[in-house]
């Protein structure tokens, strides 16, 4: 392992420039996973996938986190970029995080010690989120909501194809997919990467795509 390894979660939303990349890559996805519920909080390891967490909470009749189902990647990755879907985002629900800094020291951040906005936070990118504590929601539990949101995803998004999820952030008061459609770029291709016909903010890899194809597109 190189002296400066890259630590990643599930590897979602990463495009490697393979010819020039000589750092070791260490994935945290095989580390011990846990989810714990108490009277007020939901505690989980950072390497739990968003979909697994959402399904667990649904099965245990814990409302408010159905929007996480189908978001690619881990809960730590979602928190680090303030991921969201269906008009919700994760950071307002975070009570605290446990992290390890580049020197191996463990520290805790409370929600009021962090700042966040649309798809961004000020969390140190060189620190690793090892656990997340979320606040339980007091809304009524809807048995059908998770499946309803999943069906909406299937209709509007190419979830069964190889992609990194949405590529571009939405600009203020508009949608990246609409702008790409308006520019006539839906279906455009570079090598093995093409813009989805179902949702223009998705770049699909047909299995032969490279980072060069991605960057050109």
Regions inferred by a protein language model and the residue ranges of each:
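A generic local secondary-structure boundary/capping motif
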Residues: 14, 54-57, 65-69, 82-89, ...
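Anion-binding (especially nucleotide phosphate/pyrophosphate-binding) glycine-rich loop
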Residues: 1-75
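Short clusters of hydrophobic/aromatic residues that line enzyme substrate/ligand-binding pockets
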Residues: 34-35, 65, 79-81, 116-118, ...
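Gly/Ser/Thr-rich helix-start
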Residues: 10-12, 48, 71-78, 85, ...
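Short, basic and Ser/Thr-rich N-terminal targeting/leader segments
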Residues: 8-10, 93, 161-162
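Phosphate/pyrophosphate- and phosphate-bearing ligand-binding catalytic cores of soluble enzymes
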Residues: 14, 100-102, 106-216
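Structural signature of FAD isoalloxazine-binding scaffolds in flavoprotein oxidoreductases
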Residues: 15-33, 80-110, 124-131
């Amino acid at each position: 392992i190189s002296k400066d390894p890259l630590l990643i979660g599930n590897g979602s939303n990463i495009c490697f420039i393979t010819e020039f990349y000589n750092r070791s890559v260490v994935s945290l996805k095989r580390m011990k996973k846990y989810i714990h519920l108490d009277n007020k909080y939901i505690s989980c390891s950072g390497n739990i996938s968003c979909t697994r967490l959402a399904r667990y909470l649904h099965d245990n009749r814990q409302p408010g986190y159905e929007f996480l189902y189908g978001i690619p990647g881990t809960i730590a990755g979602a928190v680090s970029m303030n991921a969201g879907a269906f008009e919700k985002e994760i950071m307002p629900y975070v009570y605290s995080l446990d992290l390890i800094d580049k020197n191996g020291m463990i520290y805790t951040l409370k929600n009021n010690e962090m700042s966040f906005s649309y798809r961004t936070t000020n969390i140190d990118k060189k620190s690793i989120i090892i656990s997340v504590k979320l606040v339980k929601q007091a809304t009524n539990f809807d048995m059908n909501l998770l499946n309803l949101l999943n069906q909406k995803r299937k209709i509007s998004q190419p979830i069964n194809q190889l992609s990194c999820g949405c590529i571009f952030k939405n600009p203020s008061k508009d949608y990246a997919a609409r702008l790409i459609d308006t520019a006539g770029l839906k279906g455009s291709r570079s090598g093995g990467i093409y813009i989805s016909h179902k949702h223009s903010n998705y770049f699909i890899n047909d299995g032969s795509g490279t980072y060069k194809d991605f960057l050109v597109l």
